[in-house]
């Protein structure tokens, strides 16, 4: 999610250009209300000078810490380090937001150029021996009882100390030099991997000219495809893309089996076409470099290096957890496949269920078993109604209010900004909502920030997704899955907005990777609670509140298709772990390795991992050896929601406890300590199994 001091996830820069200091908006705090990024003044030519100036500024700040003649203390070393890098934080927050959500060729070129520069700067900090000695000195003082720190201060000190150790500060010069080379190469390879996926997404177009090929598709799907075609200069036709909001409805409803196969296979083979956008060699290099890095730092494999900082602690714990769930999920998935095959057999075509058939026949089975189809409930989920309901839920739980602002600069016209205030009227932060697809936006949904919370400084948080855009007179209508996605990402936003920490290094989502999904995933539970549905689910035309009959159907089908969904998620998590469990990457063919891994697991051919190796962007970014964390956190969130169900989903005492013990604390205490503070006990696996219908 975040890196200390500044984000290194992606980097960049254009050709250098002379720029007067006072003209570059990144050189000082933004001169806007709330200190929000001033997108009216930020231009392409500002980024490189700001990155270089930011590096210069932080180098001076680090030098001041190192040259301080006083004995190292928590304040003059750890706090000073945590506060350093103001310019870098400002430019990184904006630049990396745009490279993910609104990029173009110029930003991509900048990203590629600056990646090694920023990697080198990070190494210059964490391999700085004089700085490391001061940090280690403060760490030793606490260990020996010479200084007394608060729990939050202890966590911050420990985090920085470990960051130096895990960066190789304690290694000899030769090993440090090799680590620098590895870090630089990894940053460049990661950008190339992600760019290839974006290129593949943007290049694919399924253009339909014959309306007969649209058979089975609801009107809202056809209307959206017509708008896509019009925007692409193909008016009078229908255009489908690899974005979830376009691809999944096509797989779910289109009767044309060959076209379903077309869009499905292009999606799952991204990065695997032996062309300029191929990712096989890149991923192989990344795995080899990560393994070398882990071994230099004293670990047998990369997964154990990563997990040493997580709740799970080691690879064996994660593998035991995933394999335990695998038995439950695969058995259910096989039963579901058999049910779908029966529906196909009734059609008398003699066809065998294939992966591109699953969504289509699952929708038929849903209608048969529950008398419910997505097209029936989707009119009740307009984006604006769901948004309103989401904010009402947040208000009823935590007393906060969100008010739309029209005068805060944004990077795209369809981005909306909200002022967030607490029940007492105090300012909590700004929330940016960017919900529609565009060519420069990567797939998926995520939360991040333009500014982190620290002390009196309040955060600037954003959510990004790619929901269907309004088309003509039809508003943006969400699927039930997309409704849950909106609630999920807003849960992350709440974690970032409600945090009350003194130091940015431990605020908000700066927590263990396998804990960070708890605040997001627990929010999904409210999305389909009957009491909550009555608050926001209204027919976009008639304004009728969703009827009890439909709510009952939604509740009844809550565990429908969960064998499939859990199995594809587990398959991806196990692929991630097996790749990073490798202790030898010589002659690694990632596609062959994926097949071998899935064969050993016994994955049925009708299901592919949710992410295959060549487009598994999670493991290139912050979720390497960490994709399991969604399920790990689900153990926590399903158990935690039991507390709400026991006392009422809007029970004030329970909500206050969750806010104070989880959302406000950030990474200031051990995750399990925080969880026990809320729940009063360790989590149980049973609620997860029940929630997914696996037992």
Residue ranges and their predicted role:
Residues 1-4:
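Positively charged n-region of N-terminal signal peptides that target proteins for export
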Residues 14-16:
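C-terminal motif of bacterial Sec signal peptides marking the signal peptidase cleavage site
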Residues 20-42, 46, 53, 215, ...:
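C-terminal, non-catalytic "cap/extension" segments appended to globular domains
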Residues 20-218, 239, 644:
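N-terminal helix-rich structural modules
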Residues 468-487:
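Short pre-active-site segment immediately N-terminal to the catalytic Zn-binding motif
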């Amino acid at each position: 999610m975040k890196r200390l001091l500044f984000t290194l996830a992606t980097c960049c820069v254009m050709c250098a250009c002379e720029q007067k200091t006072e003209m570059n908006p990144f050189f000082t705090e933004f001169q806007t209300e709330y200190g929000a990024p001033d997108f009216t003044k930020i231009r392409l030519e500002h980024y490189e000078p700001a990155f270089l100036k930011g590096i210069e500024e932080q180098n001076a700040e680090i030098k001041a810490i190192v040259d301080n003649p006083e004995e190292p203390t928590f304040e003059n070393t750890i706090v000073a380090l945590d506060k350093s890098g103001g310019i870098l934080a400002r430019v990184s927050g904006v630049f990396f937001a745009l490279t993910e959500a609104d990029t173009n060729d110029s930003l991509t070129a900048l990203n590629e150029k600056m990646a090694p520069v920023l990697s080198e700067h990070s190494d210059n900090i964490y391999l700085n021996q004089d700085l490391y000695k001061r940090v280690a000195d403060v760490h030793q003082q606490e260990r020996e009882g010479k200084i007394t720190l608060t729990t939050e201060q202890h966590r911050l000190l420990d985090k920085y100390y470990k960051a130096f150790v895990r960066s190789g500060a304690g290694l000899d010069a030769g090993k440090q030099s090799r680590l620098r080379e590895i870090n630089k190469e990894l940053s460049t390879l990661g950008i190339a991997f992600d760019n290839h996926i974006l290129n593949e997404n943007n290049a694919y177009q399924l253009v339909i000219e014959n309306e007969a090929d649209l058979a089975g598709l609801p009107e809202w799907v056809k209307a959206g495809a017509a708008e896509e075609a019009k925007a692409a200069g193909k008016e009078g036709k229908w255009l489908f893309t690899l974005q979830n909001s376009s691809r999944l409805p096509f797989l779910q409803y289109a009767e044309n089996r060959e076209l379903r196969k077309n869009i499905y296979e292009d999606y799952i083979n991204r990065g695997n076409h032996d062309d300029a956008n191929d990712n096989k060699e890149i991923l192989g290099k990344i795995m080899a470099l990560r393994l070398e890095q882990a071994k230099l730092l004293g670990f047998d494999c990369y997964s154990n290096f990563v997990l040493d900082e997580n709740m799970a602690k080691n690879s064996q714990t994660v593998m035991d957890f995933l394999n335990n769930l695998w038995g439950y999920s695969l058995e259910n998935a096989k039963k579901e496949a058999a049910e779908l095959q029966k529906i196909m057999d009734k059609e008398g075509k003699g066809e065998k269920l294939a992966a591109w058939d699953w969504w289509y026949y699952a929708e038929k089975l849903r209608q048969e078993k529950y008398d419910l189809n997505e097209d029936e409930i989707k009119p009740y989920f307009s984006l604006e109604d769901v948004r309103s309901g989401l904010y009402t839920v947040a208000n009823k739980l935590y007393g906060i209010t969100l008010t739309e602002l029209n005068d805060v600069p944004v990077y795209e016209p369809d981005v909306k900004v909200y002022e967030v205030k607490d029940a007492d009227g105090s300012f909590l932060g700004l929330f940016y909502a960017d919900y529609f697809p565009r060519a420069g936006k990567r797939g998926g949904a995520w939360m991040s920030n333009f500014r982190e919370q620290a002390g009196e400084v309040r955060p600037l948080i954003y959510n990004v997704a790619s929901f269907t855009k309004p088309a003509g007179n039809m508003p943006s209508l969400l699927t039930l899955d997309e409704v849950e996605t909106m609630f999920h990402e807003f849960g992350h936003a709440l974690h970032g907005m409600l945090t009350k920490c003194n130091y940015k290094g431990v605020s908000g989502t700066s927590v263990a990777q396998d804990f960070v999904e708890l605040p997001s995933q627990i929010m999904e539970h409210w999305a389909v609670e009957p009491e909550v549905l009555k608050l926001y689910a209204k027919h976009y035309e008639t304004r009728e509140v969703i009827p009890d009959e439909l709510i009952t159907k939604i509740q009844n089908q809550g565990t429908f298709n969960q064998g499939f969904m859990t199995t594809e998620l587990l398959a991806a998590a196990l692929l991630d772990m097996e790749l990073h469990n490798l202790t030898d990457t010589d002659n690694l063919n990632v596609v062959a390795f994926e097949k071998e891994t899935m064969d050993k697991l016994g994955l049925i051919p009708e299901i592919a991992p949710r992410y295959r190796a060549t487009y598994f962007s999670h493991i290139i970014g912050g979720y390497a050896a960490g994709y399991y964390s969604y399920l790990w956190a689900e153990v926590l969130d399903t158990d935690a929601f039991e507390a709400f169900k026991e006392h009422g989903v809007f029970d004030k005492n329970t909500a206050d406890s969750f806010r104070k013990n989880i959302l406000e604390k950030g990474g200031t205490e051990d995750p399990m300590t925080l969880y026990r503070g809320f729940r009063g006990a360790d989590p149980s696996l049973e609620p997860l199994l029940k929630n997914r219908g696996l037992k």
